[in-house]
Swiss-Prot record:
<dbReference type="GO" id="GO:0006561">
    <property type="term" value="P:proline biosynthetic process"/>
</dbReference>
<dbReference type="InterPro" id="IPR053790">
    <property type="entry name" value="P5CR-like_CS"/>
</dbReference>
<dbReference type="Pfam" id="PF03807">
    <property type="entry name" value="F420_oxidored"/>
</dbReference>
<dbReference type="InterPro" id="IPR028939">
    <property type="entry name" value="P5C_Rdtase_cat_N"/>
</dbReference>
<dbReference type="Pfam" id="PF14748">
    <property type="entry name" value="P5CR_dimer"/>
</dbReference>
<keyword id="KW-0641">Proline biosynthesis</keyword>
<keyword id="KW-0963">Cytoplasm</keyword>
<dbReference type="InterPro" id="IPR008927">
    <property type="entry name" value="6-PGluconate_DH-like_C_sf"/>
</dbReference>
<keyword id="KW-0560">Oxidoreductase</keyword>
<keyword id="KW-0028">Amino-acid biosynthesis</keyword>
<keyword id="KW-0521">NADP</keyword>
<comment type="similarity">
    <text>Belongs to the pyrroline-5-carboxylate reductase family.</text>
</comment>
<comment type="function">
    <text>Catalyzes the reduction of 1-pyrroline-5-carboxylate (PCA) to L-proline.</text>
</comment>
<dbReference type="GO" id="GO:0004735">
    <property type="term" value="F:pyrroline-5-carboxylate reductase activity"/>
</dbReference>
<dbReference type="InterPro" id="IPR000304">
    <property type="entry name" value="Pyrroline-COOH_reductase"/>
</dbReference>
<dbReference type="GO" id="GO:0005737">
    <property type="term" value="C:cytoplasm"/>
</dbReference>
<dbReference type="InterPro" id="IPR029036">
    <property type="entry name" value="P5CR_dimer"/>
</dbReference>
Length: 295
């Protein structure tokens, strides 16, 4: 079935489920092709009233759905996946045609494949918090029964909330450490920059405005330069590494002997790179500890 004609069931109406719902609607999806399963009455009412979407049980939502996005908390996965498996079997859906997409942190593809009907295509997706404003990045890892077309269709689904890339499942713990936890690193840096700005005489409001806009503008510069480099603009090599692009931009805004050079010297002296590396390593290790695989 073509993605444009597909029915999408979102199981779990929390922040990520709502982000995907709102993103799909912004991208032009028809509300009649979307259904949400949410157990909390207040939350269910909110979603129904805000988006005019059908909110029902998981068992009803999965019936006739081409894509089933599981967006519940890890602690709720076992009973939810049991309900979905039973509903799928009862509805006699073709397991090879119904794609399950999990955004549940730490739950492996093998776990879902072991609980769902044999041959069910499973894609594991790792979006980050920026999906809430349509500017996230999602890493996808495909299970063994997923066809190239199905993976392309799932990628199109997550295009609605930001950028999408595909990685082996073995890299998802690293993805979690970089992009999943990444917004928190960013917010901590902004917090520190604002505090430092107040320390040199700025009001907190002015320091916050300056820091936030500087971060947004710097990210825009990096993304634009990456796009130029990867497209071979100005005769440059295709596929230039992002770290080299960032390094070039940093050099371009750092005058020898100037204020930025003095500031960067202090960051290096304070172990900035080592702290970032240690943080990412710790997040990756914790993600590995939280992983749930088939028994």
């Amino acid at each position: 079935m073509l993605f444009g004609m597909a029915r999408i069931a979102i199981i779990g109406g929390g922040s990520i489920g709502e982000a995907l719902l709102s993103g799909l609607l912004r991208a032009g999806r028809q509300v009649k092709d979307l259904v949400v399963a949410e157990r909390m009455p207040d939350r269910a009412n909110y979603l129904a009233q805000t988006y005019s979407v059908l909110v029902t049980s998981a068992a009803d939502a999965v019936e006739n759905a081409t894509f089933v996005v599981v967006a519940v908390k890890p602690a709720d996965v076992e009973p939810v996946i049991a309900d979905l498996a039973n509903a799928t079997a009862a509805a006699e859906n073709d397991s090879a045609e119904q794609v399950f997409v999990t955004v549940v942190a730490g739950i492996t593809i093998a776990y879902f494949e072991s609980k769902l009907p044999a041959g069910t295509p499973v894609v594991r997706a790792m979006p980050n918090a920026a999906a809430l404003v349509g500017a996230g990045v999602t890493a996808l890892a495909k299970g063994r029964f997923v066809t190239p077309q199905q993976l392309e269709e799932v990628s199109a689904l997550f295009d609605a909330v930001g950028g999408v890339l595909t990685v082996p499942e073995s890299q998802l713990d690293a993805v979690t450490a970089v992009s999943g936890s990444g917004p928190a690193y960013f917010f901590l840096l902004v917090e520190a920059l604002v505090d430092a700005g107040v320390g040199v005489g700025l009001s907190r409001q002015v320091a916050t405005d300056l820091a936030a806009q500087t971060m947004a503008g710097s990210a825009a510069m990096l993304l634009e330069r990456m796009e130029q480099d990867q497209g071979g603009a100005n005769g440059e090599l295709m596929g230039l590494r992002v770290d080299l692009t960032a390094s070039r931009l940093r050099a371009a805004v750092t005058s020898p002997g100037g204020t930025t050079a003095a500031a960067l010297r202090e960051l290096e002296r304070g172990g900035f790179r080592m702290a970032v590396d240690a943080a990412v390593q710790a997040a990756k290790s914790r993600s590995e500890q939280l992983r749930i695989t088939p028994e």
